[in-house]
Amino acid sequence: MANENHGSPREGASLLSHSPGTSSQSQPCSPKPVRLVQDLPEELVHAGWEKCWSRRESRPYYFNRFTNQSLWEMPVLGQHDVLSDPLGLNATPLPQDSSLVETPPVENKSRKRQLSEEQPSGNGVKKPKIEIPVTPTSQSVPSSPSIPGTPTLKIWGSSTEDKQAALLRPTEVYWDLDIQTNAVIKHRGPSEVLPPHPDVELLRSQLILKLRQHYRELCQQREGIEPPRESFNRWMLERKVVDKGCDPLLPSNCEPVVSPSMFREIMNDIPIRLSRIKFREEAKRLLFKYAEAARRLIESRSASPDSRKVVKWNVEDTFSWLRKEHSASKEDYMDRLEHLRRQCGPHVSAAAKDSVEGICSKIYHISLEYVKRIREKHLAVLKENNIPEEVEASELEPRLVYCYPVRLAVSAPPMPSVEMHVENSVVCIRYKGEMVKVSRSYFSKLWLLYRYSCVDDSAFERFLPRVWCLLRRYQMMFGVGLYEGTGLQGSLPVHVFETLHRLFGVSFECFASPLNCYFRQYCSAFPDTDGYFGSRGPCLDFTPLSGSFEANPPFCEELMDAMVSHFEKLLESSAEPLSFIVFIPEWREPPTPALTRMEQSRFKRHQLVLPAFEHEYRSGSQHICKKEEMHYKAVHNTAVLFLQNGPGFAKWGPTPERLQELTAAYKQSGRSHGSSSSSSSSSSSSEAKDRDSGREQGPSREPHPT
């Protein structure tokens, strides 16, 4: 994918006829604008504004005879007064990167009346090789107050085709959907999961928020701690590895009931969470708090007399040492803390074990009840529309095909109306008061994926409701907090994907989503919402016979371990070229089972290590985050492992030349696509945010403070 695909399209275009004094002889093809009764404020008239009528659009617009500017909405005078500042020297400066600009540089941000809305303009952005379909216009426009400078809420079907074309023209491209797949599978039948519906998704999101709140309250009330960061998200990932239930998100049929992931992360934070320490006073305070929390816990729980004696003696010894040692260094305090943890940790964990298991069990059983409620709601929606919940499976012809998106066996019910409006470069989609947001560029990406993959909605009547369900699903899966869950959805930089495709034939992502995928063929967590946008289903259910794949799994230990088992089984059973290039954290203290198994696998052809802070990931919130927050530095080493069978190694082997080019691709920072006008101060603050965000990738593996 060429680098110019990351640029922004040209949007400036003047009207054919502006000034009422323009001679008809000089521009014979340009009709004169029809003037309306001028009911404008005196300030606007003095500034050169007048009200005209658009014959083509059959509505009024506002034209400035001094600047040749045209607006659909009534202008509001801002910083740039054309009389006192005709050149706009005092106006708000535009960023040098025009891809950030969607509105004129005035405070009201009124939408320009441009020919770019009415006809395609030449630009360097990769355009789809398909025509934009004419969408139905029978749906009504919901009533909404019209605020000056803000587009009115509209239903997708009520917009004209030209305006849709302008909306669907991306300004930033971080994908290449033209690459065809080389992944071959056996022909498979449709999935039995129920099709998504906004009412069902709304109920599911409400119940997940309640479940998160239950988890927080249980941790606070029973253990006196805040929930470990991202532990609920990793609990859902770990549970879905073993879950045999019917819900695509919440677990309902798991063995064992107590989640190893949730249990491990809560126990790591008992009696208190140990954070990274930079200063001596912090180390002293942490040692005191740990000793106090350990004594309080052992006194309030049922524990053996020996355990109580050991903990209390070590705590008193620590307090005595703190009273005597006034000149201790940070290292002295940390050594003392490590000694206290070794002495008291096993006894504290034994005393808290039953309580923590109770938290895990309680959350699972609440989830089970919620799944029943969601299922009842879903079946009621199908019954209301006379759609059977079970469809008789037809016989499949045993043949090999290139992989294709997931199809659903159950027919989709009619979709309710969903509201959409655009705020600057963000598309806002609202259903029953619940709003989700996505940038215009990623909205256009979803449109393309839907156009390529969906087979039951050629008129795009269900596009917006399905986008709302998709965005709401991922929002609920990773939480609504700032930067929450973004590390679990991080992806590789564009330069790396380009290199993987060019050198190793990679055309498929094993762990992605419609929002962060680079290729149009990928596996994702949710076949019901994502199948309409190109997903081939969950990776652990996907069984290719040949092809070259990239795998960057969410950093959940149980999921990564299951991934290794799945890949080795596929490599063992296939005689066709098969290759998996896996990117996982190089956690060594202790090493993860997945990393250890891949290093010892007979299919490992090479292992590459990318040093911490010398390579980047793309944010999991790339579909909505600011441009300067799109990339962040990894705070841990990343191990790149090549798992290939014999034919795959012969075809896509990691030769020294290929490895050198792959390493060089990581040196091309994705930040170079950002605005070059950013100041050094904003860059440094952005880097700090990036590092904080990067820590989300492995909080369960954070080293103990040193």
From Swiss-Prot:
It catalyses: a 5'-end (N(7)-methyl 5'-triphosphoguanosine)-(2'-O-methyladenosine) in mRNA + S-adenosyl-L-methionine = a 5'-end (N(7)-methyl 5'-triphosphoguanosine)-(N(6),2'-O-dimethyladenosine) in mRNA + S-adenosyl-L-homocysteine + H(+). Its EC number is 2.1.1.62. S-adenosyl-L-methionine binds at N552, P553, P554, F555, F613, E614, H615. It is found in: Nucleus. Keywords: Methyltransferase, Nucleus, Phosphoprotein, Transferase. The keyword Methyltransferase applies. Residues 43-77 form the WW domain. One of its GO terms (biological process) is positive regulation of translation. Gene3D superfamilies: 1.20.1270.10, 2.20.70.10. GO terms for cellular component: intercellular bridge; microtubule cytoskeleton; nucleoplasm; nucleus. Residues 1-34, 88-148, 663-706 are annotated as: Disordered. Residues 687-706 have a biased composition (Basic and acidic residues). Residues 16-29 have a biased composition (Polar residues). Belongs to the CAPAM family. The WW domain is sufficient for direct and specific interaction with the phosphorylated CTD of RNAPII largest subunit. This is mRNA (2'-O-methyladenosine-N(6)-)-methyltransferase. It comes from Mus musculus. The gene is Pcif1.
